[in-house]
Amino acid sequence: MQVEITGSAVDQDTIITVADLKAHLRVTHTAEDTLISALRSAAISWVEEHCNIKLGSYTARGYLPGFYNSYIPIGPVTAITEVKYQTTEDKTYANLSTLLATNWFSDEITQPARIAFRDYPQVYEYALMPVVVSFTAGHTTMPAPVLQAIRLLVAHMYENRQEEVIGTITTRLKFGLEALLNPFRIIYQP
């Protein structure tokens, strides 16, 4: 399944505020607020990519090559709202038919979430991705370990603004991040 985020970007202050990060960094001035905000964006993106999750609530669409039972590769999925399909040549996905909710089943409890189909109609045979699954995904309440991982990443990037630090003992940040984030990772194998 190919996924496209369709909703507007989440306000990152709903995930973690710059004030929270400044308190963690023990920064009391405002001169570096822009830098800390940029580091926050990078840290949130890294956590989302590493865990295959979304922080904040997003609306999205998943595209399938047919009515195949499928996993949804990002999460946590909070609801699958509708399934539409292509019956004619339409490269803009503007004129899709809606599949009745009785013809598909979803499981949003397990992660990755799944969708299964039954009694489905014929789709346009020359369409590459004729089935469109609309859903919402994302953590609306941020888990404490995820917030701590974001704080660690921001602190690491704030203190180490270059790729390599010479003359210091090597320390491993990744283990701490893995310990915090592994319970939230969604492993998707197509």
Regions found by a protein language model. Give the residues of each.
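Divalent metal-cofactor coordination and adjacent catalytic microenvironments
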Residues: 1-190
